[in-house]
Amino acid sequence: MNGTMIQYFHWYTEGNGKLWEEVKNNAEYLADLGITMAWLPPAYKGNSGGNSVGYDPYDLFDLGEFDQKGSISTKYGNKKQYTEAVEALRKVNIGTIVDIVLNHKAGGDEKEKFNVYKVDPNNRLNFLSEPFEIESYTKFTFPGR
């Protein structure tokens, strides 16, 4: 069977915590249109808190539940609204594609020291220096949990 997917967001999707409610309220309409899969934006807390589009991952387990990065809700809503939206899609046989960025993190809570090398910008395998110590925000403590 061929399905039809909708990407239910774009970079400029309005915030204010309303997207998950919109998805929930439109689930039956989407099914009537023949939609079989819905691609939703990252649901977790990003470094930009309530303004994050989700591609600056801070806490992959905060779906709009904890007071972190200046907000409780994410740009798209809170955990309860998200789970209700996914359940509404499921009830009308629309699958959910969950977008999760796993290969980087942003907005560490504390600094850590570690060694780095200066490298050739055109070839990262070509070291231009001996290792030296730097300090950067790479420690995540999630104090809002």
Regions found by a protein language model. Name each.
Residues 2-25, 32-36, 40-145:
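Substrate-binding/active-site clefts of carbohydrate-active enzymes
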